């Protein structure tokens, strides 16, 4: 299935979970994730099934002064 992650198209197997997509991308903590503009708590990554055309945003914190 096709999903967009940070505006880049990826093909994932049907039934893929968010946790597997993050592992495949080697995402480094800390970060937050939103799917279709909906924040997903870290505790739900393993249960969150992805669907065709999902828009996933991986957001890393920015520090500054």
Q: How should each PLM-predicted stretch be described?
A:
Residues 1-64:
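Ubiquitin-like/PB1-type beta-grasp interaction modules and other compact soluble beta-rich domains
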